[in-house]
Each structure stands twice: as C-alpha cells, then as structure tokens.
C-alpha cells in the first residue's frame, strides 16, 4: 500500500486522508445543528453572496475526497525514470532523488489543498470567510514550488 514512499510521505498522506474523514465526521455529527441554508458563495472581501441547501456541503466534501484521492494515487504510481519531464537534464543515477523530491512536493501540495478545503467547508457552515486565511495554504504551496525547483536544480547540477 505504501510501497515506494518514505515515512514523511506516508505521514503527510495519512494526515490528508484523516482531515477528509474528520471533516465528513464533523459534518455528520453536527448535521442536525447546521442551519437549513448555508453559504455557497463568497465575494473577494469574504462576505457571503448566496445561500443554498445544507446538503450542498457534501459536494465540497466530495471534491475534497476526490482531490485527496487523486494525489494519494499519484504518490503510489511506480517511478518510471525515463518519463520524468524536467527543464534540466537529470544526470544518470539521480532519478531516484528527483522522484523522492517530486513525491515530497506532491505531499505538500496535497496537504495545502486539503487544509484549504477543510477551512472552506468550515467557512461555508459558519457563514464567514477570513480571506487571508483562505490564501495562506496557497502561499505555502508557492513557497514549496520554489523550494522544489531550487532543490531539483541542485540535484541536477550536482
């Protein structure tokens, strides 16, 4: 099940799956206390724009499960080194390092997107969105992208 993944990748993947399951469990436990209509749309300032039935929260949770599942599946694809698409030539023998780095990057991306979706679910139920908190996972993801490219360049250049 976790073949080809290191401990850090396994932990991050399990955290993402646990966040999805906990979000679903929290919604199911609090279902009777949720308002009949929840916020389904926010504007750029974080104010609600429209309301919908509370069952629409399951669409958001379903998308969260789909994204987390896709990232988890990508982590489990066996590495085929000749198909790596990098802007630099990868020296012979360094492909496993690049694959491990890429899987780390996928884990960080998955965690950022999952945390953002959990917060969005909470904001829809609560009815208020804190805009800077919504962007925080994407800022972390941008920093991870820069880290990934710098680290990959160092590995390729030796």
Regions inferred by a protein language model and the residue ranges of each:
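Interfacial helix-start motif at the membrane-water boundary
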Residues: 47-67, 100-106
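Alpha-helical transmembrane segments of multipass membrane proteins
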Residues: 19, 23, 63, 67-71, ...
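Membrane-water interface of transmembrane alpha-helices
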Residues: 29-34, 69-88, 148-156
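Active-site and channel-lining beta-strand-loop segments
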Residues: 27-59
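Alpha-helical transmembrane segments and their helix-start/interface "positive-inside/aromatic belt" motifs
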Residues: 5-19, 58-60
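Alpha-helical transmembrane segments of multi-pass integral membrane proteins
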Residues: 112-158
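Select subsegments of transmembrane alpha-helices in polytopic membrane proteins
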Residues: 12-17, 70-74, 101-113
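Short membrane-interface loop/juxtamembrane segments of multi-pass integral membrane proteins
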Residues: 87-102
């Amino acid at each position: 099940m976790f073949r080809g993944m290191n401990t850090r990748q396994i932990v991050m993947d399990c955290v993402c799956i646990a966040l999805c399951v906990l979000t679903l469990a929290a919604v199911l436990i609090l279902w009777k206390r949720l308002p009949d209509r929840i916020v389904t749309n926010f504007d750029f300032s974080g104010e609600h724009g429209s309301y919908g039935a509370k069952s629409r929260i399951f669409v958001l949770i379903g998308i969260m499960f789909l994204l987390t599942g896709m990232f988890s599946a990508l982590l489990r694809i066996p590495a085929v080194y000749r198909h790596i698409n990098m802007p630099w030539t990868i020296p012979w023998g360094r492909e496993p390092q690049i694959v491990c780095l890429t899987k780390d990057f996928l884990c960080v991306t998955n965690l950022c997107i999952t945390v953002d979706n959990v917060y969005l679910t909470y904001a829809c139920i609560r009815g208020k969105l804190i805009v800077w908190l919504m962007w925080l996972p994407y800022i972390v993801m941008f920093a991870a992208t820069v880290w990934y490219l710098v680290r990959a360049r160092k590995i390729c250049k030796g």
